[in-house]
Amino acid sequence: HDCVGCWHSHHENAAAISMTKTGILPISQESVDIVNMIAYHPFEGTANDMSERPRMQRNLGMEKKILILENHGPCTLGNSIEDAFLLMYLVCRSCNYQQKAMAAVGGDLSKLNVPSPQVLSAMKARAKMNVLAVKKGESIGFENGGGGIPSPFLVFRAMARLMEDTYGAEQIY
């Protein structure tokens, strides 16, 4: 698929989760929304070698929008930079929660609460509905059962305003 926006990060918790055999687990609302969009690419070094690109593309496939570079960090793709940003935001939040949950249970994955297959299926259906609504430019707020996920553009603008307020516009652009 064509990609307009791409976002790569070395976010601490996302990089840490990329170093685990489990990858991103469907244990938080954020991770359940994205887990079916994730593909993995084995570590080959610093990812600067042009010959690695075809292998990365093959591992990503035509349907996935998130590529976890193992032992490195996530890369998200979107129809816009806002789409790619929102996916990265969800990846990083998922990894934050997972890192804390894994630490809380001493790494014993059997002690983590994983939603039932029925809940995962319902959330997957809701996430699919949200994606279709955003593509059509429709609202996906709580009023129509969308779960309150705002559009990627609104999230991106809100985060940009937060950064401007925190650091000053001259420091972030």
Residue ranges and their predicted role:
Residues H1-Y173:
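Glycine-rich flexible loops
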